[in-house]
Swiss-Prot record:
GO terms for molecular function: uroporphyrinogen-III synthase activity. The keyword Electron transport does not apply. Its EC number is 4.2.1.75. Catalyzes cyclization of the linear tetrapyrrole, hydroxymethylbilane, to the macrocyclic uroporphyrinogen III. This is Uroporphyrinogen-III synthase. It is an enzyme of class 4 (lyase). One of its GO terms (biological process) is uroporphyrinogen III biosynthetic process. Keywords: Lyase, Porphyrin biosynthesis. It catalyses: hydroxymethylbilane = uroporphyrinogen III + H2O. Belongs to the uroporphyrinogen-III synthase family. SUPFAM superfamilies: HemD-like. Pathway: Porphyrin-containing compound metabolism; protoporphyrin-IX biosynthesis; coproporphyrinogen-III from 5-aminolevulinate: step 3/4.
Length: 264
């Protein structure tokens, strides 16, 4: 039988509705009891028009920047709406992260550039050619996203065209099983995969459990997928006990397993 370092641990995951289950399955395979508390709801932007117009003019761009699987899926949807496929995208494609590249490949596209680290800063730092004067299309979350990619590319002379491709919203309710676990302090660890999951978690806790909600997780370890998420955890939760060294879900799982071995 495979090693199960998470036996006896109860872990709360906070990914988007519909996106948590594969990671939850990995945690369960490692022995954890998992409670899913989605802190994001992914949906369409307020209007498809900017993305549709950009896709119609895709030949005018030198690069397409895809920073998440959500962006890949949105572009795929709007390509199909114009009776197009990834083979109709003449510009080079840059993606953040192997998982994003895998989603792109599954849709029939191919990444021309994947940065060595799975964070936005790495995409800019290791960009394979000078971007001065280049036109870059950047489909992204409509509100609440980070500005680092755009600002860094623009500082190097790139012309970055941002278009809303999807929106991520905070759910209004906490699932009953998660609410019970939080009220009864039946948790060992809470995992976060983005700054937005941290912010929305805090919003949900305040609206559902009152102003003293933080006391309910005072003895619960906080796990972060990477340094930017950790900064937000420190700002809003005051601590981070676990941080992934590789900024992926696999890296987060490994870090949680190492934490469990040290706390057993």
């Amino acid at each position: 039988m495979a090693e199960q370092p998470l036996i006896g641990k109860t872990i709360l995951t906070t990914r988007a509705a519909g996106q948590s289950s594969p990671f939850a399955a990995q945690l369960r395979a490692a022995g954890a009891a998992v409670i899913e508390m989605p802190t994001l709801e992914i949906g369409p932007p307020s209007s498809w028009l900017p993305l549709d117009e950009a896709i119609a003019a895709i030949a005018d761009f030198d690069w397409l920047i895809l920073a998440s699987a959500n962006a890949v899926e949105a572009v795929q949807q709007r390509l199909a709406a114009q009776q197009k496929s990834w083979s109709d995208v003449p510009c080079a494609i840059a993606v953040v992260g192997q998982k994003t590249a895998q989603v792109l490949a599954a849709q029939g596209g191919k990444a021309d550039y994947i940065p060595p680290e799975f964070i936005a800063e790495s995409l800019v730092e290791h960009f394979p050619q000078p971007v001065a004067g280049q036109r870059l299309l950047f489909p992204r979350v409509e509100t609440g996203g980070r500005e680092q990619i755009t600002q860094a590319l623009q500082s190097q002379g790139a012309i970055v065209v941002e278009v809303p491709a999807y929106e991520s919203r905070c759910p209004s309710q906490i699932p009953d099983d998660a609410l019970i676990a939080l009220r009864q302090a039946h948790l060992n660890l809470i995992s976060f995969t983005s700054s937005k999951t941290v912010r929305n978690f805090c919003q949900l806790m305040a609206s559902n459990l009152g102003v003293d909600w933080s006391a309910r997780i005072s003895g619960v370890a906080i796990a972060s997928i990477g340094p930017q998420t950790s900064i937000t955890c420190q700002e809003l939760l005051g601590r981070v006990e676990v941080e992934a060294q590789e900024y992926t879900l696999d890296g987060l799982l490994l870090a949680i397993e190492q934490w469990a071995r040290q706390t057993t």
